[in-house]
């Protein structure tokens, strides 16, 4: 029995180490190569293979600065200054969730969201959060802030099977992400908390309020050069 338990533990530890190696090697490759698929994209495709994933990569300099400012105003205003984790944001989210008695705020940074999108899944669990933390730690030490934001903008979800700002700009406005206006950029950034719902409810009050807040603060956010 004891030998069996030891064997199971060794298999478990080996599996964990293999996952870390997979994440590490993926991050090494993606430092210099386009990210053409993520775990979120795969999950969407597996749920309905008849529906194609809409995704087009765009280099950092070819994405409107309006969108870079908008996405950070909406998701992670301290992106330039932290090392993957915004402890003030996490504390604020915990306080709000305690007040409301349910999860109404997440506190995740752009780096944490990207780690989840690339390697994990959306269901909340301590195991997922722990792996997200490890992947975020690795990413922040292997990639520049510019690269993290570039991959995030090209990987984040904007609707059903719709990934990346270029695909979103073409879908919602029929134009490239390079020429997004402030209003358009703020709208796309405002979609992110619940993109599949807002895709069909574009006049939702919460969405419009979030867009106004992003417009108010987007010029004060600092973006990577």
Curated annotation (Swiss-Prot):
Main location: membrane
Subcellular location(s) of the protein: Cell inner membrane
Protein origin, superkingdom: Bacteria
Designated name of the protein: Biosynthetic peptidoglycan transglycosylase
Keyword annotations of the record: Cell inner membrane, Cell membrane, Cell shape, Cell wall biogenesis/degradation, Glycosyltransferase, Membrane, Peptidoglycan synthesis, Transferase, Transmembrane, Transmembrane helix
Any GO MF annotation of the entry: peptidoglycan glycosyltransferase activity
Its membrane topology: Single-pass membrane protein
SUPFAM superfamilies the UniProt entry points to: Lysozyme-like (SSF53955)
Residues annotated as transmembrane: 8-28
Cysteines paired by S-S bonds: none
Family: Belongs to the glycosyltransferase 51 family.
Pfam families: Transgly (PF00912)
Source species of the chain: Acinetobacter baumannii (strain AB307-0294)
Pathway: Cell wall biogenesis; peptidoglycan biosynthesis
One Gene Ontology biological process: regulation of cell shape
Function (record text): Peptidoglycan polymerase that catalyzes glycan chain elongation from lipid-linked precursors.
UniProt-listed Enzyme Commission number(s): 2.4.99.28
NCBIfam families: mono_pep_trsgly
Chemical reaction(s) catalysed: [GlcNAc-(1->4)-Mur2Ac(oyl-L-Ala-gamma-D-Glu-L-Lys-D-Ala-D-Ala)](n)-di-trans,octa-cis-undecaprenyl diphosphate + beta-D-GlcNAc-(1->4)-Mur2Ac(oyl-L-Ala-gamma-D-Glu-L-Lys-D-Ala-D-Ala)-di-trans,octa-cis-undecaprenyl diphosphate = [GlcNAc-(1->4)-Mur2Ac(oyl-L-Ala-gamma-D-Glu-L-Lys-D-Ala-D-Ala)](n+1)-di-trans,octa-cis-undecaprenyl diphosphate + di-trans,octa-cis-undecaprenyl diphosphate + H(+)
One GO CC annotation: plasma membrane
């Amino acid at each position: 029995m004891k030998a069996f338990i030891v064997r199971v533990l060794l298999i478990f530890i080996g599996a964990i180490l293999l996952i870390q190696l997979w994440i590490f090697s993926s991050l090494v490759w993606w430092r210099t190569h386009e990210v053409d698929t993520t775990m979120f994209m795969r999950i969407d495709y597996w749920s309905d293979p008849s529906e194609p994933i809409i995704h087009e990569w765009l280099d950092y300099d070819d994405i409107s600065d309006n969108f870079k400012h908008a996405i950070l105003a909406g998701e992670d205003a301290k992106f330039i200054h932290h090392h993957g984790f915004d402890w003030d944001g996490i504390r604020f989210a915990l306080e709000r969730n305690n007040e409301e008695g349910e999860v109404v705020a997440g506190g995740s940074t752009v780096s944490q969201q990207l780690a989840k999108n690339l390697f994990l899944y959306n269901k909340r669990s301590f195991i997922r959060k722990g792996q997200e933390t490890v992947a975020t730690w690795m990413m922040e030490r292997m990639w520049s802030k510019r690269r993290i934001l570039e991959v995030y903008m090209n990987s984040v979800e904007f609707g059903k099977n719709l990934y990346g700002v270029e695909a979103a700009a073409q879908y919602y406005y029929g134009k490239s992400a390079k020429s997004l206006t402030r209003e358009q950029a703020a709208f796309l950034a405002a979609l992110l908390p619940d993109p599949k719902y807002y895709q069909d409810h574009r006049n939702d009050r919460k969405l419009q309020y979030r867009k106004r807040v992003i417009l108010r603060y987007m010029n004060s956010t600092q973006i990577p050069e």
